[in-house]
Amino acid sequence: ALGVAQILSQRGELIHGSIKFIFQPAEEGPPEGEEGGASLMIKEGALENPRPQAIFGLHTSPSLEAGQIGVRPGATMAASDGFTITIRGKKAHGAQPHLGVDAVVVAAECVMALQTIRSRRTDSTQPLVISVGMIHGGNRFNIIADEVKLEGTIRTLDEEVRRRVPELMRQTLDGVTSVYGASYDFDYKRRTAIVFNDPALVDETLRVMKQVLGNDNVIPLPPFMVSEDYSYYQQV
């Protein structure tokens, strides 16, 4: 981007309007409880004076050769949401599990049951990822754990699927925990939105990219389930 800025600064007579370059940290969002990334830059006026009529984002990628560029119209990068589930059971001695409610067993079944949301509860043609990345529970090898915490991420490329997932998760957790006599707390946080590339802008820039790079070096991309808070700029 710096190279492009340098070239454009030398050809100012060809520019009819204003071009603004944004160099943003924390493109996958700031740490929990902090401000940062695209939302903070917007809040601090990065898109004001002048206000852009269109915005384009660039990412480097090891999957493309030098001199190539990848592009995709429509839904391109997934929305990213996060969740924390706390399973609550009842402690007992490991030799007498029938006297307790094993939060580890309940949590393990919840992890597996949540995967059926993708395979059995949502349209199989709509991409969805439910990943549990952290499991913490128990404090002694011979004691039935009374609490297990699960944390994970949800990725979606369709806003309706995204809207439905929290309720489907609650239904799943209700069913599993009730079978074992356990309970749970569920915290769901919506984070970055879907990156949706305007098809008209993509078509307009494709012609230029092919002129400069050649048809063979403009690569159509599949959708990605990774996320990028560039989507905040698109909502302004």
Residue ranges and their predicted role:
Residues L2, L8-M134, N139-I143, E228:
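Histidine/acidic-residue-rich, glycine-tolerant segments that coordinate divalent metal ions
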Residues A108-V236:
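Metal-dependent amide/peptide-bond hydrolase catalytic core
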